[in-house]
Amino acid sequence: MRCLVVLLAALALSQASGITRIPLHKGKTLRKALKERGLLEDFLQRQQYAVSSKYSSLGKVAREPLTSYLDSQYFGKIYIGTPPQEFTVVFDTGSSDLWVPSIYCKSNVCKNHHRFDPRKSSTFRNLGKPLSIHYGTGSMEGFLGYDTVTVSNIVDPNQTVGLSTEQPGEVFTYSEFDGILGLAYPSLASEYSVPVFDNMMDRHLVARDLFSVYMDRNGQGSMLTLGAIDPSYYTGSLHWVPVTLQQYWQFTVDSVTINGVAVACVGGCQAILDTGTSVLFGPSSDILKIQMAIGATENRYGEFDVNCGNLRSMPTVVFEINGRDYPLSPSAYTSKDQGFCTSGFQGDNNSELWILGDVFIREYYSVFDRANNRVGLAKAI
């Protein structure tokens, strides 16, 4: 009932002020879909899972592992073309390109999703430039074009759109999303591609040069708000954290503590706030210390399980950011499925970078402020 009241109030505010809202649907993660089909173990072995590769590329060719979106679970609708063609996308603050499958992609991966047909759009213009996003075992190949992109009540008549003609592997066959809409800085975008939010800012289509994200714990009422901060989604005050590198939404974490003792990120570390990842990644050595402290044990998928009966006695994990504490309770950093509880912390052997995904964002309403290059955090309702 509370979610319904909040949603109705938000919609009323949107209509009154011209604020743009995109409802986010919480769906099944690709990890869970693969596990249900008995495909996860083989997939992880073949992909040589390294989430850090999502965060190590600049230049003309984007490079992202297929596993980047293995844990994405919040999706929204956009429309491309005239008349509009509908797509479900991950609104991803960890990348900058917009791409969807096209009718020229004939693989089962594409056939299982909505595919854009440029021939049916009177406003489509082929840019004549290739798009290549490299994954662990192949490439998403395609091309760039211009077309009208509609996001809620915002209509951008001249947005660059990537259209895939080839997608690697069968893994995306089971995803609930069609494509990706990146919300990171333009320095991460492929050559000739302009990020959607940058276009909106340049054309003054948003009231303010910022956007905010609320992720409901139960998946109902989750919202991406463009051009505004909505106090109805958080309690207390927003606290601001400066962006340290204008590529991702990257900032400094002072330390990670348990029971007042620093167990990870000792002396400070860099972290990224990423809506395209549901879990919380960190260097394997640091994450292992956290797993040991919370009593988690590794399973055959490389995940860490905890005893569901121990949640009440497990410790709170606290992130200190810009001098303030952001605690994560056991109920926040674990997920329960079919009687098993899994830790929301995962390690990466190839990076010192921390990635604060939905595990963190569900607890803290997040504002991404491009005008001032900062992130705002407040306790979510």
Curated annotation (Swiss-Prot):
Q: Family, per the entry? A: Belongs to the peptidase A1 family.
Query: Cross-referenced InterPro entries, in alphabetical order?
Result: Aspartic_peptidase_A1 (IPR001461), Aspartic_peptidase_AS (IPR001969), Aspartic_peptidase_N (IPR012848), Pepsin_A (IPR034162), PEPTIDASE_A1 (IPR033121), Peptidase_aspartic_dom_sf (IPR021109)
Biotech utility: The extraordinary high clotting activity, combined with its very low non-specific activity may be useful in the production of cheese types, for which a bitter taste is unfavorable, for example Mascarpone type cheese. Large-scale expression of camel chymosin gene in P.pastoris could represent an excellent system for producing active chymosin for potential use in the commercial production of cheese.
Annotated catalysed reactions: Broad specificity similar to that of pepsin A. Clots milk by cleavage of a single 104-Ser-Phe-|-Met-Ala-107 bond in kappa-chain of casein
Question: What does the record give as the active site?
Answer: 92, 274
Q: Please provide, alphabetically and separated by semicolons, the GO molecular function terms listed in this UniProt record.
A: aspartic-type endopeptidase activity
The source organism is Camelus dromedarius
The free-text temperature note is: Optimum temperature is between 45-55 degrees Celsius. 50% activity at 35 and 60 degrees Celsius. No activity below 20 or above 70 degrees Celsius.
SUPFAM superfamilies linked: Acid proteases
Residues cleaved off as propeptide: 17-58
Instruction: Please report the name of this protein according to its UniProt entry.
Output: Chymosin
Cystines in this chain = 105-110, 265-269, 308-341
Coiled coil located at which positions?
A: none
Tell me, in a sentence or two, what this protein's role is: Chymosin is synthesized in the mucosa of the abomasum (fourth stomach) of young (unweaned) ruminants. The enzyme hydrolyzes casein to paracasein.
